[in-house]
Amino acid sequence: MKKQLFSALIGASLLAPMAASAADYVIDREGAHASITFKVSHLGYSYVVGRFNDFSGDFSYDAAKPTAAKVNVTVNTLSVDSNHAERDKHIRSADFLNTSKFAQATFTSTTVEDKGNGDLVINGNLTLNGVTKPLAINAHAVGEGQDPWGGYRAGFTGTTTFAMKDFGIKMDLGPASSHVELDLVVEGVRK
């Protein structure tokens, strides 16, 4: 009887790591393995593209239970970079991001939908320009595993679109330029 109990305890302890809950990750900023880029139609003739150079965040993810995932990201809106200094100054102004008043944007997930094959919809709240609105991000789990330095990583891509006016951005560049497309690449290092 003691042997059976001991064997059961050893077996349970070996299986416990497999049944563990979601792992926590920090977005890899130091290695530059993450990006937040944007694209806005320029009057319907071309596109203005850019990125945010300074952001941080973390997420919790378990491939066996993707609907339990959680995401938190903070973006330094002062770090907007469209590769044109005068345009960046205008984007930071009260016409757009109003960074003197709202130097940060945040996204906090509320629910995650599993669409199968690594495809997810991450629902959450985006706070931008002092306005908080629901936002859905179409995401894909790219992969996860050990890195060459002894860490463990997980990576995702994502896209979303939102109307500038929904976040109190009143600058009217015409109907062709009313929405912002975001492309996200996220690689996290397990804590």
From Swiss-Prot:
Taxonomic superkingdom: Bacteria
Cellular compartments per GO CC: periplasmic space
Keywords assigned by UniProt, alphabetized: Periplasm, Signal
Signal peptide: 1-22
Annotated localization: Periplasm
The UniProt record lists the keyword Acyltransferase: no
Record has Signal as a keyword: yes
Disulphides: none
Family from the record: Belongs to the UPF0312 family. Type 1 subfamily.
Record's protein name: UPF0312 protein Sbal195_3198
Organism listed in the record: Shewanella baltica (strain OS195)
